[in-house]
Every structure is written in structure tokens, then in C-alpha cells.
């Protein structure tokens, strides 16, 4: 045994004696600020890379999990052997998460990664002579203003999630945490400072004056919650300025689908102040599809994506089909039956027009012969309903287990593959028509500004003013013969605190 130990020691000593002591690396090539920026295209690419990161931060993972799954409209149930993930979704649902959750880490890391990228690009741009690349000083100021806007946009998540966060504007310096008020004041001052340097109505996927003004609206609307100081007057003034066209010309789309099909066949909704343009195989909203779609939805929606069958709308009905009586939740049944959005999603033409916002009930195969709609062939499940019709239900329970399953009750851990209606607010259009993953994802809509201004007026006691603003948007959701019944201005007593919250949820 001793001899064996000595052999090991000698072997290790031999490795040490022959190890390299010169640890300086030999660099054969590298990309630095000095050699990357060769032309104006390189500068533009560096700028838009920050938007790509912003989309990733804003439209996947942490934002949905921390802001939506913790609320009462969306859920990610355990579906038999699928989706428990160590209980992380259950803890979000029950508000029992810990600081060790991946979502909490990502809620901190993703925005700060975006901030670091902004700071790095800002440092590059501030030290570049744009005229060398035949770009004007005005263009340089615009690009820098966009990066500062994106940096604040990332801070919007941080102040909402954590309140106390470092204000980081330098790529070298490590900062201590700042107070919520300090973070708020930094965000506000940055946005106000860059407004004049941005154009109006810039177009798709870029911040402009209205985009920055809209972020200020969000900032002021949430100020009381974030810093304990009411800023509703400032919110009202900024929102009204946007509606008055001070920062660009926008209008409410007459078609409720318009903002969400922007980008299809060249259509651009005038309602979208800021939208992220996506394109299949180049820049995709993959998480938005996969997280909420069933594995078999590809056969009804016409695409070749698998889907994860993760989440769905929170249920409106109990195990026996009765409506829940809770004030919160029940997102599907919060839509009146006369609301034209409350329909099963269905493509109705060859050019990608569709109706409805929900996958619900029995699922049927896409009609390739017509190029839209469905055939009579039923799609079948693969888990609890393997070989049986896939029928989405607005309930949570182990129905496939009969009375034994019902006895378990309705709980987030007792889902099945068909549990929950699926929201398709962002339409997944036919791949065979080259429309799949081609519609933009709207980050800021003019409707949000109308509703923010309405909230300010409602809080100040001007219910009629609030009702008119809400009605200006929601009139498109009802047939003319039904509108008088649902107009808030005509039925002002219906506009209560609870109804206002429900209407915000529907929009």
C-alpha cells in the first residue's frame, strides 16, 4: 500500500515538474472596438443587438413568470409526469417562491445583462467619430438616445421586481445599491433628457419620441407603488400629450386583431408605438409559442414546432363546471359572450385573417386543401388522452382518472394535457402560407396610453372622462347592436373599481 502511495506521489510530482509555467496566452486574432467598427453597417448592427437582447428579456422567462404566473390570469400546472420542475411553478402560483428560484435570478440577471450591453455599446459610440463612417452627429445622438432608452427600459423591470438596485452607467465601475427613489429619478431624468434627440414615428422595432414618452407614462403610473409618491398628474399630462400627437401620430386600430397581426403581408398597425418585428428562421418568438402550445397544436395551427404544453389561462370553472365566485381570476369568463374576441381561434382566409383569441374545446386538423380553417378530423392527445380527442377545458383536474381523480380536487398540481384554454392574442398563422412567426410582437400600444390616462382620471374622480377613454378603445370589440349595452359612458354605474381592473385584464 505504501509503495502504491509513493508511486502516485511521484506521478503527481512529475506532472507538476513538466507543467507549463508561462501562462501568457498567444492571441492569433481578436475583435475589439478598434477593429470591429469598419463601416456604418457595423455601427447599426451593434445598436440593434441591444434590441435583440431587449426582446429576449421582455418576452420570455422572468417577465412572464414573475409578473403573470404570480397573478391570477395565467398558470403553469403540473400535467401528470410533466411540468412539476421541482415545484418551481407551484411556488410561483402559491406565492411561496424563494430567493433561490431561477426566475428570481433571471429577473435580476437578464435586465442587468441588457444594461451592461447598453453601457458597452454607449462607451463605443461615445468614443467613435461617426463622420468617419459618413454618419452625421445627429445620427450619433439618436443612436445614443436609443441606447439610453433601452437601458431605462431594462431598469423598469428591476425597479418593479426588486426596488433597491445599483444604478450602473459605466462599464468599469461596480456600484452599491440605490434606493427606489434614486432609481426612479435616474430613469425619469434619462428619459426626459433624450426625448429631443429622437425622431417621431421612427417605425418598427426602434424607440422614438412616443416610445420614450410611453415609458414615462408607465413610470409615473407606477410611482406610488414603487416609491410611495403619487405621480398621477404627471402621468395624465404625458399620456394626454401622446394622444394629442405631440410625440407622433398614432391611432386606435379599428380591427381588434390589427395590433397583433402587424407585420403580416406588409401591414403595420398605426396603434403600435413600439413593436418587435420577428421573422421565422431569423428572429423568432419561440418561447412565446412553445411555452403555451400543446405538442399537437402544430397540426391545427399548421407549423412544424413541437410546443412544450406548459401554461394556460387560469380556470374559470370548478371540477363540476360551475363558475368560480372569486373576485379575481376567471380570465376567459370575464369576457362577455358578446365580445367578438371570445371565440375559438380560427384562420378564416388565405391571407392570414383570423378570428378569436383562444384555443378551446375540441381541436381539429388544419385544412390544407383550402389553406385555412379546419377539417372534420379530430386531433388526438398523447398523454392522458392518448388516441382520444384533444379537448381543451376551462378547468383544472384529473378528469381522466374518474372519481378517484375528482376526489383529489382542483389544484395547480392536478393538471392534464388538455387543462386550460390557450390564449393566442399573438396569432400563430399558417406556416404553409409563410405567415408563421412573421407577425410583430407589440411592446407598447396606443391602447395602453388610453387606459393609463383613463386610470388617472378615474382615480381623480372623473369617471365620465375615464369611461370615454376606455370606450374609445373597446368599442371595436362589440357589434353595433350590442354596444349600447356595454358602453361605460352609457352605463356609468357599471364602471366600478373591480370592473376597471377586469377591463385592464381583458385589454
For each feature predicted by the language model, list its residue ranges.
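Bacterial Sec-dependent N-terminal signal peptides
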Residues: 1-29
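An aromatic- and glycine-enriched ligand-binding surface/loop that stacks and positions planar moieties
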Residues: 20-85, 192-193, 206, 210, ...
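Conserved, well-structured interaction surfaces
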Residues: 39, 44-58, 80-162, 174-182, ...
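C-terminal substrate/ligand-recognition segments
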Residues: 105, 354-471
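Short coil/turn linking the two alpha-helices of tandem helical-hairpin repeats
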Residues: 159-160, 164-166, 202, 222-229, ...
